[in-house]
Amino acid sequence: SDVCSSDLIRLDDNDRVVEILSNDYRIGEQNLAMNIYVIERESLIHLIHDASVRGLVYFERDILARNLKLLNVHAYRFDGYVARVSDMKSYFDENMRLLQEGSMDALFGPAPIYTKIRDDNPTRYLEGSSVKNSLLADGCVIEGSVENSVLFRGCKIKKGAVVKNCVLMQDTVVEPNCNVEYVVTDKNVHITEDKKLTGTDTFPVFVAKGHSV
């Protein structure tokens, strides 16, 4: 379903894009667009302005596809790990997929991906803590139980708290004796003591940035 909702592209023998097909349901091997583009700033501004005065709003369909004969648009082949994140469900699913064997290696490979750096202490696992099949960034403090979850940097899981099948973003705090399952939190979320939050794999609970529940 994700493939069908993406753009397909047709190329000539020189990898020049000659056609963009939006929401096309063709079967078989196809060239799937990743919707990543490198373009000169002034050219982009000109194209957006021209589309705006005409009431056009979609970049691929209304700007690129309409100007393929005028623009020199080429494709670069990428055979690595690709995930389409378009809503909360797909965001949750793709994070959970990182916990599967081989997914991390497929994503990063031998070449590192450099992101914003915030040097922090290594994650601390205190006495009585339990962590299974999870991916934790640095700066976390774990006193409770974490299973099948992705924790961003600086998360704190207090004593007696149980976290399962969750994606917890930066500096999320789960207080003692909480039980959270199938939950996605934004940054700086505070889950108060003895709280129970339970979603499902098809409809995870989302807690917005900075909220306390």
Predicted regions and their residues:
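Short, small-residue-biased leader/transition segments that mark boundaries at the very start
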Residues: 2-5
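Conserved hydrophobic/aromatic beta-strand scaffold that supports enzyme active sites
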Residues: 8, 36-38, 204-206
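A structural signal for short hydrophobic beta-strand segments in well-ordered beta-sheet cores
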Residues: 9-11, 75
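Short, well-ordered beta-strand micro-motif
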Residues: 10, 38-40, 84
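Short, flexible, basic/aromatic active-site loop/helix in glycosyltransferases
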Residues: 11-28
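A short glycine-threonine-serine/GTX helix/turn-capping micro-motif
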Residues: 26-36, 79
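Conserved nucleotide-sugar donor-binding
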Residues: 35-46
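Left-handed beta-helix
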Residues: 42, 50-213
